[in-house]
Curated annotation (Swiss-Prot):
One of its GO terms (molecular function) is energy transducer activity. Interacts with outer membrane receptor proteins that carry out high-affinity binding and energy dependent uptake into the periplasmic space of specific substrates. It could act to transduce energy from the cytoplasmic membrane to specific energy-requiring processes in the outer membrane, resulting in the release into the periplasm of ligands bound by these outer membrane proteins. It comes from Klebsiella aerogenes (strain ATCC 13048 / DSM 30053 / CCUG 1429 / JCM 1235 / KCTC 2190 / NBRC 13534 / NCIMB 10102 / NCTC 10006 / CDC 819-56). Residues 106-122 have a biased composition (Basic and acidic residues). This is Protein TonB. Residues 69-79 have a biased composition (Acidic residues). One of its GO terms (biological process) is protein transport.
Length: 243
């Protein structure tokens, strides 16, 4: 009868198994100890009140002054001298000589003819045979006879064909008022009266309207116009007169 002996394991394997077993056992012990251990009772919280005056304010951080770096001065631009300006040459033109004034032409002198002097007739010696009652000798007529000026006739003005008297205002007639009116008017080429103007009226604002109404109906001969003609119209209780 034969016995089977267990095989021998190599020692490195055994060492590895032992290390792993120790690690596993340590982990199990730690976990079990944490579960079983009771938590310690909570300790009271202490609060300390601090007065605000006791607290020192934090020191303000001093700003860091950076050194001012002065910029380098820029180089001054070179001054370029301006070229000399050309002075324009002024050419003086000769002033024109004034033209000589034309000499006035001598006026032709009128020749004055000398007047002929008429010598008086010398008396002749009286002959004893001549009659003493003879008429004296006639003197020659003067050569300077006065020239007669031609007579000019003024052209006749427009000839009136229809010129009725102005009517006497009833108010003036009732009050027995008389008056005078002086008018100025023009006569057209077809014989009508226009531009009637009252030059004077006494008394005023009494006869003027009736005078203008009558003059607008006047008619003169056509083709003989006239301007600035005047007329005096007299209002009398016994009638109206025009001149």
């Amino acid at each position: 009868m034969t016995l089977d002996l267990p095989r021998r394991f190599p020692w490195p394997t055994l060492l590895s198994v032992a290390i792993h077993g120790a690690v596993v056992a340590g982990l199990l012990y730690t976990s079990v100890h944490q579960v079983i251990e009771k938590p310690s009772p909570s300790q009271p919280i202490e609060i300390t009140m601090v007065a605000p005056a006791d607290l020192e304010p934090p020191q303000a951080a001093q700003p860091v002054v950076e050194p001012v770096v002065e910029p380098e001065p820029e180089p001054e631009p070179e001054v370029v001298p301006e070229p000399p300006k050309e002075v324009p040459v002024v050419i003086h033109k000769p002033e024109p000589k004034p033209k000589p004034k034309p000499k006035p032409k001598p006026k032709p002198e009128k020749k004055v003819e000398p007047k002929r002097e008429v010598k008086p007739a010398e008396p002749r010696p009286v002959s004893p045979f001549e009659n003493n009652n003879t008429a004296p000798a006639r003197t020659a007529p003067s050569t300077t006879a006065a020239t007669a000026k031609p007579m000019t006739t003024a052209p006749s003005g427009p000839k009136a064909l229809k010129r009725g008297d102005p009517s006497y205002p009833q108010r003036a007639q009732a009050l027995r008022i008389e008056g005078d009116v002086r008018v100025k008017f023009d006569v057209t080429a077809d014989g009508r009266v226009e531009n009637i103007q009252i030059l004077s009226a006494k008394p005023a604002n009494m006869f003027e309207r009736d005078v203008k109404t009558a003059m607008r109906k006047w008619r003169y001969e056509a083709g003989r116009p006239g301007t600035g003609l005047t007329m005096n119209i007299k209002f009398r209780l016994n009638g109206v007169k025009m001149d």
